Every structure is written in structure tokens, then in C-alpha cells.
């Protein structure tokens, strides 16, 4: 069971990351990540929707007829998004004004409907909640990384206006990375989003291509340690020769 939960976490955070792994939700990723603060706010809102929709759909999976499951999933997701939208408007009004229409457009996010269809409709509530949480955290991390890179290169700040958008308790996050920075306009415009997201895609592919080699080296080192402890192999000196 712990291994399956670990796989759910690994899929959400890395292997099937909504942005870098599945290349979904690119519209909000490119549009609202001009700052890390906006990315964090959008990511947290999407995480709440993912968790709640997965839990509700998993709990109702045996009562929803297969023929109408997609419309039913969309209605459930739309209801949850409406609640989140109203909550943001009530308690984080400044952030709601910045994110604007993209909160309502969470309903059309393919990743949320995809997790409902591929996971929540087939597995239990606990596993579905974990899947929603991990997918949401992975999505939030991707948005924050994209937003941070664009904000640092574009305006020389990090988490600017966090206290205004997220509340006064987040004032400690506001950083001025480059004082008197003239700015790099293209990075806070949509073309900058394409450049940063494309770079993250390439970086993930490079890391994934190296993973089999790294895992093989780790496995070989563990095997050698076992055999050395058992006396089958002699320990090696620093020069690489056997003692």
C-alpha cells in the first residue's frame, strides 16, 4: 500500500506533472505566471478543486451511470469551482481580481477532468484525495517556478505584492532580488512564458533521460556493498584496485 501511495506522489510531483509531464493547463500557466505570487494563488485554488472533485467523484463512483459520467463529472467540478471562486472573491478579493476569469476557467482544465476519469472514478476516496493533493502540489510548484523565473528576470523581484494578494501574513515572502533593476519586459509578457515553460520541458526530458543510468549505478553500488559485507567481494581502494 505504501508503495502505491509513493507512486501516486511521484506521478503527481514529477512523472505525470500536469505542466511538465502531461503538458496540460498551459493557458493559465502562460497567462497568469507573470509573478510567483499569481502562480501560487492559482495553484492553490486548483489544488483545492482537484482534491474536492476527486473525493466527491470517488465517493459517488458507484452511483453514477457510465453513460453519463462525463457530464456528471463536469457538473461536480463546476459546482466546486463556483464555491472556490466565491470564497476567493470574499476572502482574497485582490487576488481574485488579478486571477479574474482564469478561476472560472478551472472548470475547463483538462487535468481535473482527466484525473476524475482516470483515477477518482476507479479508486477509493483516500487514494483519490492523495492523487488530487499530489497533482495539485505538482501543478502549484510548476506555476511558482515559472512565475519566479519570469518575475526575477522580468522585474528583479520575487513574490511581489504577496501581502496584498494573499494577505498581510505573507509579507515575509516579498523579496527585491536586483535593486534598481531596469527590467526585461519580454519575460513578464506571454512570449516569456513560452520561453520559460519550454526550458522546463527540455530540463525534465534531460533529467528523465539520465534517470535509468543513475538508478542502474545506485543499484550496482548497493549490490557491491552487499557482496562486500558478505565477504564475496574485497573492498576497493581509492585507486579503484581491490585490496
Swiss-Prot record:
EC class: translocase
* Places the protein is found: Cellular chromatophore membrane
Q: What induces it?
A: Expression is reduced under iron-limiting conditions.
An annotated GO cellular component of this protein is:
plasma membrane-derived chromatophore membrane
Task: Please list every transmembrane segment annotated in the UniProt record, as residue ranges.
Answer: 40-60, 72-92, 94-114, 129-149, 152-172, 183-203
* Pfam families (alphabetical): Rnf-Nqr
Primary residence: membrane
Q: Which residues form a coiled coil?
A: none
Q: State the oligomer form and interacting partners.
A: The complex is composed of six subunits: RnfA, RnfB, RnfC, RnfD, RnfE and RnfG.
Q: Which family does it belong to?
A: Belongs to the NqrDE/RnfAE family.
Q: What does the protein in this record do? A: Part of a membrane-bound complex that couples electron transfer with translocation of ions across the membrane. Required for nitrogen fixation. Involved in electron transfer to nitrogenase.
Write the protein's name: Ion-translocating oxidoreductase complex subunit E
Where does this protein come from, organism-wise?
Rhodobacter capsulatus
Amino acid at each position: 500500500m505504501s508503495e502505491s501511495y509513493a507512486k501516486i506522489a511521484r506521478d503527481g510531483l514529477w512523472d505525470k506533472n500536469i505542466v511538465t509531464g502531461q503538458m496540460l493547463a498551459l493557458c493559465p500557466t502562460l497567462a497568469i505566471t507573470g509573478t510567483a505570487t499569481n502562480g501560487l494563488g492559482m495553484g492553490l485554488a486548483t489544488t483545492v478543486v482537484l482534491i474536492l472533485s476527486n473525493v466527491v467523484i470517488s465517493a459517488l463512483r458507484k452511483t453514477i451511470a457510465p453513460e453519463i459520467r462525463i457530464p456528471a463529472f463536469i457538473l461536480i467540478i463546476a459546482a466546486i469551482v463556483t464555491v472556490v471562486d466565491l470564497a476567493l472573491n470574499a476572502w482574497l478579493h485582490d487576488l481574485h481580481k488579478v486571477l479574474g476569469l482564469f478561476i472560472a476557467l478551472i472548470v475547463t482544465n483538462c487535468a481535473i477532468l482527466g484525473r476524475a476519469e482516470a483515477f477518482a472514478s476507479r479508486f477509493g476516496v483516500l487514494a483519490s484525495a492523495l492523487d488530487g493533493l499530489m497533482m495539485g502540489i505538482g501543478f502549484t510548484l510548476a506555476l511558482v517556478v515559472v512565475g519566479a523565473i519570469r518575475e526575477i528576470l522580468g522585474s528583479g523581484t520575487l513574490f511581489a505584492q504577496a501581502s496584498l494578494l494573499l494577505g498581510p501574513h505573507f509579507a515575509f515572502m516579498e523579496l527585491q532580488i536586483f535593486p534598481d533593476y531596469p527590467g526585461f519586459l519580454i519575460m513578464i509578457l506571454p512570449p516569456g512564458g513560452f520561453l520559460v515553460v519550454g526550458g522546463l520541458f527540455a530540463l525534465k526530458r534531460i533529467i528523465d533521460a539520465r534517470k535509468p543510468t543513475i538508478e542502474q549505478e545506485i543499484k550496482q553500488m548497493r549490490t557491491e556493498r552487499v557482496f562486500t559485507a558478505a565477504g564475496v567481494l574485497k573492498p576497493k581502494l581509492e585507486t579503484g584496485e581491490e585490496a
